[in-house]
Structure formats: structure tokens, C-alpha cells
Amino acid sequence: MPTKARIRLWSTNIENLNFVVNQIKTLAQKTGVEISGPIPLPTSRMEVPVMRLPHGEGKKKWEHWEMKIHKRIIDIASDERVMRQLMRVRVPDDVYIEIELI
């Protein structure tokens, strides 16, 4: 029974994340390996309110900075040659990947 690899990807840049996901999908289609996904997970949103005035006197005006973290999961049959090709996929600096054999 072939094992599966669960690939978790996350990034703050959605375009780069989708680029890597499409590379993995085309790799799986070329090799004819079974793939399920990409499954989009809920986007984490972190908001940090910061007071504009450095000294704290006068009117209190706030700036709100936010960062969104987008996540995807892909399950792929872990054939040895597919895993080797998967390691060669070019990944931008702001996309993070975890590979887990299940």
C-alpha cells in the first residue's frame, strides 16, 4: 500500500503560494500520481493597532496594521521519484512548506 505525503504550505503572499501549488499540481499530473487538493484552510488574520503619536499627548489616533496568512494542504501519493522532483521545486522566500508522510 503506497504511503501518502501531506504537504502543508503557508504564506503571506497569495500569488506566490498559488504559484507553488500550481507547480506541485503540474508535477503530479506529469508523473500520473494521485493527488487530492489543494485544500484551502481558513486565512489567519492578525491586526496590530499602533498609536500614531510617539509621545502619547494630544488626540489619540491609531493606525491598524494587518497581516494575513494563507494556508493550503495537498495530499499526494509518495512515490520515490515524485518526492525527489518535489524537493527540486523552486520555492520563493515567503512561502513555507512542511512535508509529512502519513
UniProtKB/Swiss-Prot annotation:
Keyword Transport part of the UniProt annotation: no
A GO term for molecular function: structural constituent of ribosome
GO cellular component, one term: small ribosomal subunit
A Gene Ontology BP annotation from the UniProt entry: translation
Keywords, alphabetical: Ribonucleoprotein, Ribosomal protein
Pfam families: Ribosomal_S10 (PF00338)
Keyword Ribonucleoprotein appears in the UniProt entry: yes
Subunit structure: Part of the 30S ribosomal subunit.
Task performed by this protein: Involved in the binding of tRNA to the ribosomes.
UniProt record similarity statement: Belongs to the universal ribosomal protein uS10 family.
Descriptive protein name: Small ribosomal subunit protein uS10
Organism listed in the record: Sulfurisphaera tokodaii (strain DSM 16993 / JCM 10545 / NBRC 100140 / 7)
Underlying gene: rps10
